[in-house]
Each structure stands twice: as structure tokens, then as C-alpha cells.
């Protein structure tokens, strides 16, 4: 039987989602907890990979097993007793056997947070900017993502992507306080480091390091070296993974 598990985590102390040698990962912690409770070695498949220090408010994964020997809510409770305090499970649900955490996802939404003044309480979860930014221009530039498909310019060099085509359905800067903004972007898929490179390039637009014409050239020429730098991962949150559940 196949089960989906929905959870969130603070990525500060993890080297990303995926298991890797000699480094702590969220996948490792989740598999360890499931293996203890179900009394056999478990493998979980995530909706995607988050990099070192990146957070997730609502991540999804699946695992296969015989019917779990308890109610899903009880499994959630017991998992949260075992897992570290920076990982929280919200829901476990049985799904159709063909549902796949990664390949059945129809959308993913990320938020990237910026503070325009120094804030000691947000320093671990946002990028703190000391220079002025023109968010109106940044939003104007972001709208071009809705009509563009090839994101080679924002893909980490040497990646293993078979294609750099992504379908972006939302891209905008949203202000939540006089000094707090976040960039929201939704797409069917993302390339490695894509969101952080997109944010870095939009910041270059906002601080007028590049013109709108130069931004459009970057968008269309596909050269990673021309785009902005990849922003730090601590301000990036995987906000939601969308599925079309039939039940």
C-alpha cells in the first residue's frame, strides 16, 4: 500500500532533503522514525530536493508498506514524538498506488523572504538588505516569467537536468510590513538553485545594476554567468506542493 506523508521542517541544521554521506538530512530523519515505528527498514520518496539550509512549510513524500498497524493520526502523533523538534509531520494518508510524491505533483510554490532593515529575530530566515530596492521594477520584471519557458539562465551549472523547461504560473513580490517582502513563485517544476538565482537577478533589477532590457536579454540568452548571483538558502521556503487527489 502507498501512503503520503505531509510535513514541514526548519532546514537550518540539515544538508538539504536528500540523504548524502556524512551529512544530516531530513530524509534520513524521516526514514529513521518510520523504520522504528513500523519495525522494518523504510524508504521515503520526496516531492523534490531542497538544498542545504532551505526550509519547507508543507513538503510531501510517499512510502510503501503493508497496512500500517495504527490509525494515520496515531502514526502522526508517534512520528512527532520521535522526530527532532525542527521536523513536524502534519498528516499521513493512504493514496492510490500510482500516486507518486514527485511525479504526481502538479505544482510547487516557493517563498523567498527579504527584510529591508536589520532584524536580529529574522536573520536566520530572511535576506537582510541594506540598500534601496525598487520593488515596482522587480514586479514588472517578474511578470515576464509567466510568458517564458526556458530557465537555463537560472540553472546551476553542471546540473543533471534533462530539460530546462518550466511552466511558471505565478511570480510576484508581496509586501507584508513596511520592511518585509517575499517573492512568491509557482511552477510545475523547478531546476536546482533556480529560485535563488531568479531572486538574485530580480534584486539586480531592483537596485538598478541591470536595466529591464538587460534582464530580458538574460532571460532569453540562457547564460547562467549573465544572471544574478544565487541568494542564500536560509531565506527560501518550500511553501506548498500541489496534487490532484481524486478522492
Predicted stretch roles:
Residues 1-247:
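Structured-RNA-binding interfaces characteristic of tRNA pseudouridine synthases
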Amino acid at each position: 500500500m502507498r501512503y503520503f506523508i505531509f510535513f514541514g521542517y526548519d532546514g537550518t541544521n540539515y544538508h538539504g532533503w536528500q540523504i548524502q554521506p556524512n551529512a544530516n538530512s531530513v530524509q534520513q530523519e524521516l526514514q529513521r522514525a518510520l523504520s522504528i515505528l513500523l519495525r522494518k527498514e523504510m524508504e521515503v520518496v520526496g516531492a523534490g530536493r531542497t538544498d542545504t539550509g532551505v526550509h519547507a512549510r508543507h513538503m510531501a513524500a510517499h512510502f510503501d508498506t503493508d497496512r500500517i498497524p495504527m490509525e494515520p493520526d496515531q502514526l502522526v502523533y508517534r512520528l512527532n514524538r520521535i522526530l527532532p523538534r525542527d521536523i513536524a509531520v502534519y498528516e499521513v494518508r493512504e493514496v492510490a498506488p500510482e500516486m507518486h510524491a514527485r511525479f504526481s505533483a502538479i505544482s510547487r510554490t516557493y517563498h523567498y523572504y527579504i527584510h529591508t532593515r536589520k532584524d536580529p529575530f529574522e536573520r536566520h530566515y530572511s535576506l537582510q538588505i541594506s540598500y534601496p530596492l525598487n520593488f515596482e521594477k522587480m514586479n514588472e520584471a517578474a511578470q515576464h516569467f509567466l510568458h517564458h519557458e526556458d530557465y537555463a539562465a537560472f540553472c546551476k551549472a553542471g546540473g543533471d537536468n534533462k530539460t530546462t523547461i518550466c511552466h511558471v504560473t505565478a511570480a510576484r513580490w508581496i509586501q507584508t510590513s513596511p520592511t518585509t517582502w517575499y517573492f512568491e513563485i509557482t511552477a510545475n517544476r523547478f531546476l536546482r538553485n533556480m529560485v535563488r538565482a531568479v531572486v538574485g537577478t530580480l534584486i539586480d533589477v531592483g537596485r538598478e545594476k541591470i536595466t529591464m532590457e538587460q534582464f530580458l536579454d538574460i532571460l532569453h540568452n540562457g547564460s547562467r554567468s549573465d544572471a544574478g548571483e544565487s541568494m542564500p538558502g536560509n531565506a527560501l521556503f518550500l511553501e506548498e506542493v500541489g496534487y490532484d487527489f481524486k478522492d
